[in-house]
Each structure stands twice: as structure tokens, then as C-alpha cells.
Regions:
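Hydrophobic/aromatic beta-strand elements that line small-molecule binding cavities or substrate pockets
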Residues: 16-19, 61-63
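A short mixed-secondary-structure module that forms the rim of ligand-binding clefts
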Residues: 19-54
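Charged, gly/pro-rich active-site loop segments
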Residues: 58-117
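Short glycine/serine/proline-enriched coil/turn segments at secondary-structure junctions
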Residues: 10, 54-55
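Short, surface-exposed beta-edge/turn micro-motifs
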Residues: 15, 24-26, 43-46, 91-95, ...
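A short, Trp-centered hydrophobic/proline-enriched beta-strand micro-motif
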Residues: 1-8, 46-49
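General beta-strand recognition
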Residues: 2, 26-27, 58, 104
């Protein structure tokens, strides 16, 4: 999927790989040293977009940092390959969850399905 953030008045989009449900919330992960982290702290509004088998999904909302070790560890457990670069207590690993979010699932063959969470 792709994650879009804002830097000043400029949109920034990049491919992302982590998406994890923890405690019923949709989480993503990054490192505090990355530009995406700085952008989300300055403006938490973000959107992800993915495409598969003729359908696409857009999830728009606010990404809120969860600074608990348990949340970071849950993400790392879901993505073991990340443990080569990150640790839950390394001071760099950061997880965010979607708040006030709307997911829209679309295709050319059906009306959009909208889910809020």
C-alpha cells in the first residue's frame, strides 16, 4: 500500500509495508528518525491506498502515536523481519493507529463501500 502525509503544503506519498490490528485498531509502524514520523507529528492527517484484484481501498483519518512498548512489540511480532532493524525499546521504533477514520472500498464494477472506525 501507499501512505500519504503532508509536509507543509506539499503532499508526500511513499510505499509502506506494515499494517497490523492491535486492540481492535489499525496500526502502522515507522522509525522516529524518518521524515514520515516528523510529518505525522506535525500533521496527523494521513491516507493509505491499496489496489488488489480490481478493487482499491482508501483509508483516511488521523494517525495517533501509541507510545506503549506493548503496541510496538505487537507490531514487531507481526512482522518478524522488522526485528533486524527495530526493537520495541530502541528509542526509534514508533507505531501509530488510525483515529476518526473512513475506509472506502471502490471498483468500477460496484458502488463504493464506506466503513467508519
Amino acid at each position: 500500500y501507499y501512505l500519504a502525509t503532508v509536509e507543509g503544503n506539499q503532499p508526500r506519498v511513499r510505499p509502506f509495508g506494515t499494517a497490523h490490528i492491535f486492540e481492535g485498531k489499525l496500526y502502522i509502524q515507522t522509525g522516529k528518525v524518518k521524515d514520515v514520523s516528523k510529518q505525522l507529528h506535525a500533521n496527523p492527517k494521513a491516507e493509505i491506498c491499496a489496489f488488489k484484484s480490481g478493487e482499491w481501498i482508501r483509508v483516511a483519518g488521523e494517525l495517533v502515536e501509541d507510545d506503549r512498548v506493548e503496541a510496538r512489540q505487537s507490531m514487531l511480532d507481526a512482522y518478524p523481519s522488522l526485528q533486524k532493524m527495530y526493537a520495541a525499546d530502541d528509542g526509534n521504533t514508533e507505531v501509530f493507529y488510525f483515529k476518526n477514520a473512513t475506509a472506502t472500498i471502490s471498483a468500477f464494477t460496484h458502488e463504493p463501500e464506506v466503513i467508519t472506525f
